[in-house]
Amino acid sequence: MTYRDVASKSVLIWACTAVGSRMPVAMAPLALVFLVRERPGGYTLGAALAAAYVIGEIIGAPVLGMRLDPARGRRHLVVGLLGGAVAFAGLGVLPGAHPVVLGAFACGAGFAPSAASGGLRTLLTSLVPERAVAQALSIESMLMSGVWAVSPVAVAGLALGIAPRVPLLLAAALMAASIAGLWLLPARWDKDGPDGETGESKLRVLIRAWPVYVTGAASLTLLGLAELTLPALLEQRGIAVGWSGPMLAGLAVGAGCGAFLYGLRTWPGRLRTRSVVFMCGMSAFVALAALIPGPAGIAVALALGGTLQAGAVITRNLSLRETLPPGAIAAGYSVMYAAVGAGYAVTGSLAGTLLQVVAPSTAILAGVALGLLLTALGWWGEVRGEARAKASSTAGDAGDDTGAGLGARAEGAPVARRGDA
């Protein structure tokens, strides 16, 4: 079980496709701000467009994710990515349009391809042996860390160096190119056929996995608050705000390193236990970043926090695979994506509110407390769910034994008898 198990032409094609579909997502919020910043009230409008984009993602991920059919996976992903490419192109071609029109394009750009993340992750795990799923998810995490590290630099360079519309036109081109990549990959990800179906509605199955979503949202909520309040924290410490960029880049590098390290070996303990350990460690490092006075210490703490966050994210994705039947995994990833997006949106509001009444360091510590609370809630939910499942299984076994006994006593009786039903 090493990274050699995932080294294949299909995984390489998947990686290129994933970059094409995910880089526009990473570019979008900042690109929307640059698109309209020269208008009167441009920054306010840019923030509103970015919010419309995020709202589209949060709504679209669960709505479209629940409609993902493993047997027709490629068709669904192509339609979503095509819609996203058209919306991004509309923003780039019509930068001077009425704000309502731009808002509609922004919302559509977030909504249409929002299920692609879950679908592509499920497709990736279908391309590798079952024993190498953790390594595949580690590779995905490393890849996405790189995408999120490069995207802001690319947006700023293109918008300021060429034209504000160029990042959005590039986003449209990348998303369209990812559609071409999908045609080189399997059309479906239910390679073993439909199994694990119980007749229970997909919605109920997905709701049952709520503890995993809560813990997943907690991981990004915690680091999201640290990211958003970092410039204010540096000002509080008397450190140049310009250091925030390199520090956040270090956080992204730490996340990539953490993902690589996670895939190097099999880790002991249950998935939920590992998740709690990663979350508590990450919380400790974020708290240290809030308390350490020097820039070097803050940078190291954030990098180590990012390293542990990667482990927490991969563990949550593995937990989702363990919790859901195969036919609902892609939808589960999409719901997780929406939960994380909602958590990040709430984090932004929380950061803005807290910074008006408390010091930045206190705001970060409040975020740590919230993250630990959500982690505890998710852990409790998983323990409770497992206990219920065991109780149900025990009751079912008892019923089977009773039925078997009745059947033995009624041997030779008509089929209509209860023992033979």
Language-model-derived ranges and their functions:
Residues 19, 99-115, 217, 298-311:
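Hydrophobic core of transmembrane alpha-helices in multi-pass small-molecule transporters
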